[in-house]
């Protein structure tokens, strides 16, 4: 039982109690014998009884009125509605309570405003109906294909998490998905060609600007007796908080993206193709590049040597060796270039000083055990050969 039913039941109880008391008083008064001079003894309706009857009728009237009102506002289907219609209404109410599914929202296309700015019909600027900001050229738009209204993706996604309608025109997007309609409106290719032949027989009507002018003239010449879309007038637009921020009758063209039919079809087709490609899982292939075999035991010890030593313990010497605190030194001699200069050693020393320790990558530095000289320093390993690929060489990342 709903809260409205509890309130109505609580209001009826005092009235029924007063009615029972008044009935008891009326019965007691009728049981007493009347005066002997009156030939007929008819019971009279006392003023208190009349007031109680009026109050009871008014209470029943208000109970019925509020019951219908609360039932209409809560969206509960009437008893006369068919089971299929009632199930559809309940599904719509449940969908409105939880919003649209993320997979359904992802079917609405997104694109840059600069891609359609020069192709849209009309010269006015577009703006988002939720945040009320005009679109910039580098901003992304999300189009609702059912009503052609555009928004920022983060704005409309947050709205559709709790709603199933368009914030501008209140078009129910859940009904479109439930009925199995296609997201892209329109018929097949032959139907579109037939419509173009029938609707656009004159070259003047095919131009986009006269088409818009004709539409505005038809709307301005609407007769008073012609019914207007009451749902659009009543729910013109709602903000993210739910209250209406656009007055009825206000122009909403600044929220609507009008595109030629061929451009619109191309955008929808490209969006579907991109979504299909994004869902494909490409097989992972092996790399064609092969390196030289590495001694894993030596590599583990080398990695431990370079990773466990902090960067502040490095110190460069003038002879090109690198000292590792009290653990010893790893000396990398410079490789002479074609001019015979010693520029490589200076460059290596600068790299050792300026780069952090975690950026180093050694190829084959091996520190033998027990190698301590008389000065208390570890033995140094010198690189031999012009290529610098033997033990003791240090490679910098490219």
Curated annotation (Swiss-Prot):
PANTHER family per the UniProt record, alphabetical: E3 UBIQUITIN-PROTEIN LIGASE ATL6 (PTHR14155:SF263), RING FINGER DOMAIN-CONTAINING (PTHR14155)
Protein name: E3 ubiquitin-protein ligase ATL6
GO cellular component: plasma membrane
Catalytic activity annotation: S-ubiquitinyl-[E2 ubiquitin-conjugating enzyme]-L-cysteine + [acceptor protein]-L-lysine = [E2 ubiquitin-conjugating enzyme]-L-cysteine + N(6)-ubiquitinyl-[acceptor protein]-L-lysine
Entry's localization field: Membrane
PROSITE patterns reported in the protein's UniProt record: ZF_RING_2
An individual GO BP term: defense response to other organism
Region (Disordered): 368-398
Enzyme Commission identifier(s): 2.3.2.27
Entry GO MF terms: ubiquitin-protein transferase activity; zinc ion binding
Zn finger intervals (RING-type): 128-170
Domain notes: The RING-type zinc finger domain mediates binding to an E2 ubiquitin-conjugating enzyme.
Induction text: Up-regulated by chitin or cellulases elicitors.
Record keywords, A-Z: Membrane, Metal-binding, Phosphoprotein, Plant defense, Signal, Transferase, Transmembrane, Transmembrane helix, Ubl conjugation pathway, Zinc, Zinc-finger
Signal peptide: 1-29
Membrane topology: Single-pass membrane protein
Family from the record: Belongs to the RING-type zinc finger family. ATL subfamily.
InterPro entries, sorted: RING-H2_zinc_finger, Znf_RING, Znf_RING/FYVE/PHD
Pathway: Protein modification; protein ubiquitination
Record lineage: Eukaryota, Viridiplantae, Streptophyta, Embryophyta, Tracheophyta
UniProt keyword Metal-binding present: yes
Keyword hit for DNA damage: no
Membrane-spanning ranges: 50-70
């Amino acid at each position: 039982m709903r809260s409205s039913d509890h309130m109505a039941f609580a209001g009826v109880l005092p009235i029924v109690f007063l009615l029972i008391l008044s009935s008891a008083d009326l019965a007691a008064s009728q049981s007493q014998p009347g005066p002997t001079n009156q030939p007929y003894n008819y019971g009279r309706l006392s003023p208190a009884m009349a007031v109680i009857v009026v109050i009871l009728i008014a209470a029943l009237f208000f109970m019925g009125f509020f019951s219908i009102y609360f039932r209409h506002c809560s969206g509960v289907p009437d008893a006369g509605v068919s089971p299929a219609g009632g199930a559809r209404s309940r599904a719509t109410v449940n969908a409105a309570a939880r919003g649209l599914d993320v997979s359904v929202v992802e079917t609405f296309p997104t694109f840059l405003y600069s891609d359609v700015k020069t192709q849209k019909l009309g010269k006015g600027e577009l703006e988002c109906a939720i945040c009320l900001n005009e679109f910039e050229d580098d901003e992304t738009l999300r189009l609702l294909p059912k009503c052609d209204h555009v928004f920022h993706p983060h704005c409309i996604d947050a709205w559709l998490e709790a709603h199933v309608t368009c914030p501008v025109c209140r078009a129910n997007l859940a009904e479109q998905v439930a009925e199995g309609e296609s997201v892209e409106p329109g018929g097949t290719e032959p139907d579109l060609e037939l419509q173009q032949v029938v609707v656009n027989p004159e070259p003047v009507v095919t131009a986009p600007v006269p088409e818009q002018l004709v539409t505005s003239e038809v709307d301005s010449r609407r007769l008073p007796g012609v019914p207007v879309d009451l749902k659009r007038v009543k729910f013109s637009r709602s903000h993210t908080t739910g209250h209406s921020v656009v007055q009825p009758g206000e122009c909403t063209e600044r929220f609507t993206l009008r595109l030629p039919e061929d451009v619109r079809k191309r955008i929808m087709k490209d969006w579907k193709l991109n979504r299909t490609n994004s869902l494909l899982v490409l097989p992972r292939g092996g790399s064609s590049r092969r390196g030289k075999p590495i001694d894993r035991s030596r590599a583990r010890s080398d990695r431990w040597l370079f990773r466990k030593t902090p960067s502040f313990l490095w110190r460069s010497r003038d002879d090109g060796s690198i000292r590792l605190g009290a653990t010893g030194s790893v000396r990398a001699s410079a490789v002479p270039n074609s001019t015979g200069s010693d520029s490589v050693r200076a460059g290596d020393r600068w790299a050792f000083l300026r780069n952090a320790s975690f950026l180093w990558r050694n190829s084959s530095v091996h520190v033998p055990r027990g190698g301590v000289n008389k000065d208390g320093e570890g033995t140094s390993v010198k690189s031999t050969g012009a290529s610098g690929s033997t033990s003791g060489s240090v490679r910098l990342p490219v």
